Regions:
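Iron-sulfur cluster-binding electron-transfer modules in prokaryotic oxidoreductases
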Residues: 28-334
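Residue-level detector of alpha-helical hydrophobic segments embedded in or interacting with membranes
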Residues: 1, 19-22, 40
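Intrinsic-disorder-associated, low-complexity terminal segments enriched in Asp/Asn/His/Tyr and depleted
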Residues: 7-10, 14-22, 29
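Cationic, low-complexity basic patches in intrinsically disordered or flexible, solvent-exposed regions
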Residues: 3, 26
Length: 334
């Protein structure tokens, strides 16, 4: 059964409610494992992982708990807008996400997200506002004035916006991750689908090459899987077109799936839930549009890593996908 697609509320700034700024944060999980590193983040799950892609929220919780990473969920955070707020107002996008970042700053923690779109949008806003501290302080004062009217903390530019992928690779470290592997994913051929927001929404990405990335492939190798390369792994999935140019969105998704299948992939793995919606949830429609069978499982990054840590598939929501993940599990003897 197909999952509902997410939608955004009216983007008019006069309907934006930022007034619930006094609710306490709550820990999503506590660090029960004892790795050599102790990591703690202000966790921004985004709206898709709490709705249409609930298995991403579920698997992130399972993975971080197993690794001993503590997440303090930002329950007061707003949807980042996934790039749509700026169509109405750049000030709206900047103010909403300045507030999201300020919530993490209050905790003196990096803001962690498992959504490439959230990373791209919030990370880009953070980059812009840090520049404005010297290049356009009046604009930044305008944003902080709007936040003050809603009894919200000001943006200070004192933290970092970081995707879960980069936290695993650069903070936790692949050597540490390898020590936690209890079930090597030997023989599983994984094709990374980075998409566009993670790599190119910001001017500077210190963790990977925006055009020839390797961070996901390095994670695959660490957990015993085999990386598969194909041309479209860093291109847009087509999701932004899905509401007004459906055929083009289906064509883009179909091309990527065809390329991964032709390269011998057993599954696609993505760090973005919106990419997952277009490549998994809509894959039956994409296959119908393309005129041929696809049936390529699409996993969220934390699901794949968590499998290698011995976490049961059901605890990772692998039964929630539109395209069955059974072929992946059978290949792993599960």
């Amino acid at each position: 059964m197909q999952r509902p697609t997410p939608h955004h509320n009216n983007r008019r700034s006069d309907r934006l409610d930022l007034t619930y700024c006094d609710r306490p944060e709550r820990p999503l999980n506590c660090a029960t494992a004892m790795p050599s590193l102790t990591l703690k983040y202000a966790y921004f799950p985004g709206c898709v992982a709490q709705g249409a892609c609930g298995e991403l929220y579920q698997s992130t919780a399972a993975l971080t708990k197993a690794l001993g990473i503590e997440l303090l969920e930002l329950k007061k955070a707003s949807c980042c807008g996934s790039g749509t707020f700026k169509e109405d107002s750049r000030l709206l996008e900047d103010t909403v996400n300045a507030r999201n970042i300020a919530l993490a700053e209050q905790l003196n923690l990096p803001l962690l997200t498992h959504c490439s779109t959230c990373q791209g949008v919030i990370g880009h806003v953070d980059e812009r506002l840090k520049d404005f501290q010297t290049s356009d302080p009046a604009y930044l004062n305008q944003i902080n004035g709007l936040l003050q009217k809603q009894n919200c903390s000001p943006y200070q530019g004192t933290t970092e916006v970081k995707h879960l992928l980069w936290a695993l690779v650069t903070d936790y470290g692949l050597d540490e991750l390898q020590k936690r592997v209890t079930r090597k994913l030997s023989g599983l051929k994984c094709a990374a689908f980075y998409g566009c927001y993670l790599l190119r929404a910001q001017k500077t990405i210190p963790y990977d090459d925006p055009y020839q990335p390797e961070s996901m492939e390095n994670v695959f190798r660490t957990v015993g899987a085999t990386p598969v390369y194909y041309p479209g792994r860093t291109q847009c999935c087509g999701w932004p077109l899905s509401s007004y140019a459906t055929d083009q969105a289906f064509q883009m998704a179909g091309n990527h799936l065809d390329e991964a299948i032709a390269a011998g992939a057993d599954c696609l793995v993505t760090p973005c839930p919106l990419c997952h919606l277009n490549l998994d949830s809509r894959q039956p429609e994409v296959a119908k549009f393309m005129g041929h069978k696809l049936d390529l499982p699409v996993l969220h990054l934390p699901q794949l890593v968590a499998l290698a840590l011995g976490i049961p598939p059901k605890a990772l929501g692998l039964d929630r996908h539109v395209v069955s993940t059974r072929s992946v599990l059978e290949k792993l003897g599960l």
